Amino acid sequence: MTCSLDFSWLRWKWRTQDGFSQSPSETTPLLSPETDRQSHNTAEQRVVYPNNSMCHQDWKKVCRRYPGNSICTTKYTLLTFLPQNLFEQFHRWANLYFLFLVILNWMPSMEVFHREITIFPLATVLLIIMVKDGIEDFKRYCFDREMNSASIQIYERKEQRYMLKRWQDVRVGDFVQMQCNEIVPADILLLFSSDPSGVCHLETANLDGETNLKQRRVVKGFSQPEVQFQPEHFHSTIVCEKPNNHLSKFKGYMEHPDQTRTGFGSESLLLRGCTIRNTEVAAGIVIYAGHETKAMLNNSGPRYKRSKIERRINTDIFFCIGLLFLMCLIGAVGHSLWNGTFKEHPPFDVPDADGNFLSLALGGFYMFLTMIILLQVLIPISLYVSIELVKLGQVFLLHNDLDLYDEETDLSIQCRALNITEDLGQIQYIFSDKTGTLTENKMVFRRCTIVGSEYCHQENAKRLEMPKELDSDGEEWTQYQCLSFPPRWAQGSTTMRSQGGAQPLRRCHSARVPIQSHCRQRSVGRWETSQPPVAFSSSIEKDVTPDKNLLSKVRDAALWLETSDTRPAKPSHSTTASIADFFLALTICNSVMVSTTTEPRKRVTTPPANKALGTSLEKIQQLFQRLKLLSLSQSFSSTAPSDTDLGESLGPNLPTIDSDEKDDTSVCSGDCSTDGGYRSSTWEQGDILGSESGTSLEEGLEAPTLSQDEPELCYEAESPDEAALVHAARAYSFTLVSRTPEQVTVRLPQGICLTFDLLFTLGFDSVRKRMSVVVRHPLTDEIIVYTKGADSVIMDLLEDPACESNIDVEKKLKRIRARTQKHLDLYARDGLRTLCIAKKVVDEEDFQRWASFRREAEASLDNREELLMETAQHLENHLTLLGATGIEDRLQEGVPDTIAALREAGIQLWVLTGDKQETAVNIAYSCKLLDQTDTVYSINTENQETCESILNCTLEDIKRFHEPQQPARKLCGHRIPPKMPSVNSGAMAPEIGLVIDGKTLNAIFQGKLENKFLELTQYCRSVLCCRSTPLQKSMIVKLVRDKLSVMTLSIGDGANDVSMIQAADIGIGISGQEGMQAVMSSDFAIARFSHLKKLLLVHGHWCYSRLARMVVYYFYKNVCYVNLLFWYQFFCGFSGSTMIDYWQMIFFNLFFTSLPPIIFGVLDKDVSAETLLALPELYKSGQNSECYNLPTFWVSMADAFYQSLICFFIPYLTYRGSDIDVFTFGTPINTISLTTILLHQAMEMKTWTVLHGLVLLGSFLMYFVVSLIYNATCVTCNSPTNPYWVMERQLSDPTFYLICLLTPVVALLPRYFLLSLQGTYGKSLISKAQKIDKLPIDKRNLEIQNWRSKQRPAPASASASASAPATGTVHTRPPCHPVPPEAQQNFGASTSKSSGPPRQKHVEDRVLQDPRCSREHSRDDTCTVDTLAKLSSGECLLDPNRTVAPTAYSRGQKDVSRHSSKGSHRRSQSSLTI
């Protein structure tokens, strides 16, 4: 991808160096005007002709060949149901195996059972599955019939009007008209919308689960709402891509009769299954119909994964097959030897029709096949059916666990993959996203920096310290927090827009522009009179308390902006102009949709209920009390000077920003601390409106009075970052009023409405990492590009054209850039998400040239994405930096506790995030992924040789203090240490953490350094991958999963996590605020990260333990029962006969012993949930497969052989010498084996309930009831033998009772003795936990506390720090790294109050840096590492040129100035920080 972009950029530069002088045919062959209208490549493109009178013949030739809109999701018809269903069922190996045995049994020479008897089990299974498939298919048929019969208005060519027809009558090329609330019947290209702005609102919940509305706009050139769309006047040909399943990707162009082309994309495509909302009428032409629609192409079945236990079962099945082969071979050889003892043919041997007898060899071969029929149950085919039933029961229990239900979102766990529940108990590695997974993804605006001046928003930080108190005071308070300016305007309403020049301004009370509403009213048991909930608009996110100093400057900027068309503008780099552009960028540069609360989404809602009068009076009283506090506190507020330029004074105690010797400027009010007052616990209400606003109590009440008629605006955004920035701008009265595909309207603080022409929108993508909008300013008529994006990208695109002619401006911009970068580092270390805001003014001529190429790129089909990327990159350069924002994404509740528990469970946790390194590191400390006692290695490099050298040096350094605790594992020829290393000396070495970025990952993957990287990670307690792309995330997961052969789990909430989720053994999606892509691609979906704790530690452990022990029991049960028939062959001449009735053998597995294992697999609990949560280390039993592995399998097989010997030979010795018949001998054996197997099951059960007892007792009693009825009624059911009255006679024989009591005791005695030893002297964690569970609650809690104190000894660093000097413990450094003396100075003087944890004194920080880390160093291609510097406590060199402590920021610090030339950004540096 990188190579293709580089080549495209070179081609673009070559193409544009002559000033866009090429013609369209020279630049893009696809867009050549000489292209013939009919020369379309139908093999790679789809050509759609309209179904009207003009193009009907072309439509018949081309479009009639496309599939219709009728869907058929059924698998069968009445004629094909029986043969097709049988054909599908016999694709299963188990059914083929049984069919093979039935065919063998039908051969006269190998008939063991009656033919009807052998058919019965197979026919029963086939019939049950056939009925199930038939019912499911009939339901699909009913659904298809309902969908196909739905009505829609289709344009009829002959009648020349829309007529009501069925969905199944829709064809490609038809014109379809839809009303509000109708479902889109096919994939339709939007050609008309009744919305004045040419927009159609869609609800895509049926398609992707997202509830916020989407906008689709009419194809360019057709947006004329005042003119009704006439299909007969549409003569264009549509060329688009072939049908595919990409919901968000679509490209094509419309070729008009004059051979001009208009491009379109997914923004104009209405997908089948979506619902039209808030749009009266929408019309379009059908592009894809029926099974070719994107919705149908995405309608795949549930994902299938094979669990680890299932793979283990398949291996053991082969062992059983080998055992079956051996037993059959013994039977065949024994049969031949038995017959060989007769001198002549045995008297019971029957000749064939010709009088010939079988030879001994042929008779032995037939006996081999006969023994396969006889011992067929040795292969536990029914085990797979039991496993499916058990997993259904486990999923049911998961769904009904209230602890996995989130009340706030009204979501519970979803199990999308039903066959891997047991894998939840064997996870060894977890790969987690950060944003929305560890954090809430509820973005809160915290701080900002504008042209080098930092505004800490102290009052906003104080307000966020007590969100609960704010929420309880009602919604009325929120509307006052953005009323920072008094109403200065007269009556009247105006929207200001440029139509070739600026028009006079008119004042307005409010912005009354046409707004299409699409907010929703959600029912929560009562009618909410406040603003209904919308996406990313909780009270914490919407309410922003403005900074006092910035508030006054914003007012000046708004006044300057208002009069910028009547007087000469200030210099382009003035603070006032930059502030105005900054807030305009926050308001405009997004994709936020605007609606009003007075026009809810068109659905049937419940009428409002009357609210109690007392509640309203209380709210009014609270409101007046708050406003009184406001008016009192404002009298004590100080007035901050208003900056008009960068060099003006910023305050009496603050340095000027033009001074080279001073540090960056932080414009904070009052006694603002360096962290923005995050730790403040009080809130001065008077700081909300600002000291200079001059708003008295009466004015504060007047403002909302003037705008009572104005509908409350609400915003819906696809990204929470965008919503946070829009609400922040609104807090400063830069309000986004409306947005259409063509225009965006912003209301200024004075009430003036500016309507910008929205020329182009360059959406965000993961490659560019930014988005831009191109607008025309309504006052200056300038074309402006507003860009926002990651600082790692924006900083490299800054190059103001004014710097070429003005050296002073260049110096000033460099200082702004340097100080902004320092503020960004501060925000990142405080755990804030950062975005840079920039702008660019484009000449009209240059823009027109660029726009022509952009339109060509939009209209192309070949390399469309590449061409769009080229045009965007060409425009987004030479930017002017406006400022940056810091947005807080709070940790979810319970995340630190969950991570700590998962760690104690032996799970390795990696965080893979696209955020910048400093932000991710701070969040890692906050969520306890990294501890202040850890030694953290931070590797940043782009060069492969340097990366290899750093990895080698790091490994050498780590190995001096760590050595493998267990035997190393092989990894592709290399020795890999275990993940829990120990220490050479008696003292415990600090834990290791690794931080790595995306550039380094590229070097690792491209340089074949995966093995070294994995070897390093095995020593690390935590691994943090920053700036990683979705592809890199999936590559890391696959690398660890395949190379280390471990069980992996990926968890995320966004579309960028889909590849990572799909690559892991288990993928978990979080139902967050970034859509449902992650959930739809996951195996399990949860609402919060903290649910992962119980999901894995409790349900995961239970699911694995239950299923594993049930599988082992199934193998034991079948082998034990089959061996009874095998031992009998030694006493019947290996004839293949049985001493048990055939029907009794069938009933044994079908009824008598089938239900207890299923109940055991669903409900058994070896350890209680409370103990599992209190002792997470119990989870390791599943990781080590203690319940089901090769030793446990063979121990169970040996036990089965022993018990079968006892169950056969004790009755044999008892009845030896008697004259009983075969069934009288076999009935006690059958009864004893059933009793032994059920008692064995009872001994394995760890939890006893009434249901367990009823099932076991019921199975035992069922055996006697069925046997008594069968033996009394079935006289000739199994001729020539006669089981008549056998059980009745046995029940009157005391010997029967004696052996039925004695034999199971002898058979189960060894297992009972072994279980007793394990329970008394067992050293396993599970055995100890089971003992604790049996204690009373008080003693149990005390034992758990003692266990935790033993398992978690005090860190060795605590004792080491007592004897260590204040500067910290010094580790022996590798001899290959000299330490320069200047690197050992102490920079840790400042203190920290930020949310990140403080670094303790015994922590050692070291840095390895590459010579290429700054422009002053020579660019060296060698992989040597120059420096290993040991720093004092509190330091963390996040890059080689910076020495700022990780959690502290002081204006008094002197940092090394940053080289600001292009290409010197720290992304190009190579460093290793420890």
Swiss-Prot record:
Compartment(s) of residence: Late endosome membrane; Lysosome membrane; Endoplasmic reticulum membrane
Bilayer topology annotation: Multi-pass membrane protein
Cytoplasmic side: 1-92, 137-316, 382-1119, 1164-1192, 1241-1249, 1316-1474
CC cofactor: Mg(2+)
GO biological process: lysosomal membrane organization
Pfam families: Cation_ATPase, PhoLip_ATPase_C, PhoLip_ATPase_N
Protein EC: 7.6.2.1
Example of a GO cellular component annotation carried by this entry: phospholipid-translocating ATPase complex
The keyword Translocase is annotated on this UniProt entry: yes
Biased composition (Polar residues): 19-30, 1383-1397
Keywords: ATP-binding, Endoplasmic reticulum, Endosome, Lysosome, Magnesium, Membrane, Metal-binding, Nucleotide-binding, Translocase, Transmembrane, Transmembrane helix
Compositional bias annotation for Basic and acidic residues: 1401-1421
Amino-acid positions noted as binding ATP in the UniProt annotation, renumbered to this chain: D433, K434, T435, E722, F764, K788, R833, T913, G914, D915, R1027, K1033, N1056, D1057
Function: Catalytic component of a P4-ATPase flippase complex, which catalyzes the hydrolysis of ATP coupled to the transport of glucosylceramide (GlcCer) from the outer to the inner leaflet of lysosome membranes. Plays an important role in the maintenance of lysosome membrane integrity and function in cortical neurons.
Name of the protein in question: Phospholipid-transporting ATPase VB
Organism: Mus musculus (Mouse)
